[in-house]
Amino acid sequence: MRKGLAPCGPSQRVSSNAPTSGAGGNLAAVVAILARDAGDLPIAYQLLIYPATDMRRGHPSHQTNGNGYLLTTETIDYFHDHYIDEPAHDHDWRASPLLHPDLSGLPPALVLTAGFDPLRDEGLDYANRLVAAGNRATYVCFERQIHGFITMGRVIDEAHAAVTLCAGELVRALAR
């Protein structure tokens, strides 16, 4: 990433965001930590949309929301098993950023979740850890929604509200 952004020059700011889903939020969170530790990548903001932050998959929402909605426990397990090849890697912060011992000094963040998403609780826990570590983080849960709702603007009105919220936060963050 640093090599790809080098032509932009040192004054350019980057947002670490996840326009896809939980896996994109996972990668964005990990990249923000790596960039902080490297000290040379100017990430201005983290937009974490229903992020997967704990590969152990033990949060209560995995049980309560793991069946009957778009993203199921079976689907999560399928993707997990294609991403993580050793069970011990679930405990590595590079797979589970929630487990990093030091989340201080990270860019401001918006963590957006859905009420009926198996990933809801780990997103909330990550937002809480960011705040506890002294970062500016906002947590918003669209309580009546499922994983992936933000891409369903033609059928779900709250998707428009979520996109508007995300766009507004990015505009403010990148204007600084």
Q: Where are each of the predicted segments found?
A:
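Alpha/beta-hydrolase superfamily serine-hydrolase fold, recognizing
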Residues: M1-R176
